[in-house]
Amino acid sequence: KPISTTYILPSNEHVDIKDIRLMFDCFKKQNINFLEILFTKYYYLNPVYADIYQKILNNAENIAHYNNYAAVNCIAGMVFEKRAALCHPYPSLIDRIEKYGYDRKQLHHIFRCEEFLNRFISGESYANCLIPTNIEFLKEVKSNPIFISLKNAIKLADESVERVKTIKQNYMDNVAIKINSEVDTLLNDTLYDIFKLSFIKELQL
């Protein structure tokens, strides 16, 4: 049975530990939060399985384009989710909400995801989409408490949501769904090879 857990560090940072089977399922759901780890330069691979897993990293773009509808739905869904959280007093956000009326980080994510969606559907590589073109603006949104007032934050967030709804609908109306079966094969074969090697090593103990 796949098992995953979350470790909470003394700094309150969260580290997700995922069973590789569940991780591959997350890749297929096309969520940016999981796919982006395929593109980072900072990672450690268990040397025992590195050669097998390298095929996954070599096919990062193909995996990130496994299902175009799932990708668009996930990116748009993140915008809607961040809008819902913008002024909501979640326990982890309540200090910011009480002080400023909204969470700047959520607004930052809304802007970032809208730009990502536009670039993704225009055909840019996933690797490029992960790097915002308006980094300085996003830094100001995220870090400067007086950069955007509460009233303007709500207005801008709502406008972004409406644009994203339109972009998503136009895409679904005019672009056919594409599912890359070769990615299914790659992920399944990689899982098989990793588990096979793991079992062989266990039997040798």
Residue ranges and their predicted role:
Residues 52-193:
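Conserved nucleotidyltransferase catalytic core and NTase-mimicking acidic/glycine-rich helix/loop elements
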Residues 1-45:
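Metal-dependent nucleotidyltransferase catalytic core
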Residues 35, 129, 202-203:
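Residues in flexible loops and secondary-structure boundaries
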Residues 188, 192-205:
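Intrinsically disordered, low-complexity terminal tails
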